[in-house]
């Protein structure tokens, strides 16, 4: 779908401090998430990136500052409505499963919304098909591979037709092939659905998939821009403890001039 350049989410001067902690986890964080685009929020462990996801959906409440959703500032009372529009896929999908088999798990959110049975069956079948898991609709989620489990988690989110999908380290437990397959699926979802993707990750290879990158370091926005801009600053990425994508490491070893390069681009160059 053609990208809409308006912003679906905005954080303005947001601070956050966990109860009992002396230090703030987030300090004066401000950024915008463009609608219908893929924004990657990257940083090492402890940079505050996952806390941002919790603030967006109201799992935690900002200590100071404003969070805006669809042009409207949100209060503590609004988060139930926000959760109607935002779906999250976590690092370990096991923690999200509630159904005994795949199709029941995908149906869970729809049941909570009192969707009529026949309509529910239609939505569940389509959502499972969208993630390529039709053959596993009657399987137990816990019997699936890591990549398959994440596909089921995504199907459960898609069934509710969210405006935003947040992937919170969703690929960190997957092998390289499963990770690549899941990223292809997310690209397909972005291309065919009216949805904004927010990927929270320490994996810069995953961040290459996005349209926009926000770099977090020690609870602040360190830098942001498109992937080409961010990944040209190799020194900055290394200084804050982020591991360069494999394609860029090889590019460096071979002495090529361009710093930003995808795996496909490196193959073409070789």
From Swiss-Prot:
Transmembrane segments: none annotated. Keywords: ATP-binding, Cell membrane, Membrane, Nucleotide-binding, Translocase, Transport. It is found in: Cell membrane. One of its GO terms (molecular function) is ATP binding. Signal peptide: none annotated. Residues 9-243 form the ABC transporter domain. The keyword RNA-binding does not apply. ATP binds at residues 43-50. It comes from the Bacteria. GO terms for cellular component: ATP-binding cassette (ABC) transporter complex. It is a peripheral membrane protein. Its EC number is 7.-.-.-. Pfam families: ABC_tran. InterPro entries: AAA+_ATPase, ABC_transporter-like_ATP-bd, ABC_transporter-like_CS, ABC_transpr_CbiO/EcfA_su, ECF_ABC_transporter_ATP-bd, EcfA_1, P-loop_NTPase. ATP-binding (A) component of a common energy-coupling factor (ECF) ABC-transporter complex. Unlike classic ABC transporters this ECF transporter provides the energy necessary to transport a number of different substrates. Belongs to the ABC transporter superfamily. Energy-coupling factor EcfA family. Forms a stable energy-coupling factor (ECF) transporter complex composed of 2 membrane-embedded substrate-binding proteins (S component), 2 ATP-binding proteins (A component) and 2 transmembrane proteins (T component). This is Energy-coupling factor transporter ATP-binding protein EcfA1. It comes from Staphylococcus haemolyticus (strain JCSC1435). The gene is ecfA1.
């Amino acid at each position: 779908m053609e990208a809409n350049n308006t912003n679906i989410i905005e954080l303005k001067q947001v601070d956050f401090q966990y109860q009992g902690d002396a230090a703030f986890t987030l300090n004066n964080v401000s950024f915008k998430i463009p609608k219908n685009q893929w924004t990657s929020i990257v940083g090492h462990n402890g940079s505050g990136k996952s806390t941002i996801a919790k603030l967006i959906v109201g799992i935690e409440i900002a200590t100071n500052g404003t969070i805006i959703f669809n042009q409207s500032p949100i209060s503590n009372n609004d988060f139930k409505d926000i959760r109607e529009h935002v779906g999250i896929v976590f690092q370990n999908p096991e923690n999200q499963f509630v159904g005994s088999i795949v199709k029941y798990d995908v149906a869970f959110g729809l049941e909570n919304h009192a969707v009529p049975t026949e309509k529910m069956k239609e939505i569940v079948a389509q959502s499972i098909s969208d993630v390529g898991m039709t053959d596993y609709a009657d399987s137990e989620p816990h019997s699936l591979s890591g990549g398959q489990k994440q596909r089921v988690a995504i199907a459960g989110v898609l069934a509710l037709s969210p405006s935003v999908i947040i992937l919170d380290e969703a690929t960190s437990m997957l092998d390289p092939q499963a990770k690549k397959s899941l990223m292809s699926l997310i690209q397909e979802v972005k291309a065919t659905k009216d949805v904004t993707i927010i990927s929270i990750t320490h994996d810069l290879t995953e961040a290459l998939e996005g349209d926009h990158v926000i770099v977090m370091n020690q609870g602040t926005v360190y830098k942001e821009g498109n992937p080409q801009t961010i990944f040209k600053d190799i020194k900055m990425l290394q200084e804050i403890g982020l591991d360069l994508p494999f394609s860029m490491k090889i590019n460096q070893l071979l002495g090529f001039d361009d710093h930003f390069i995808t795996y496909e681009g490196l193959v073409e160059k070789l």
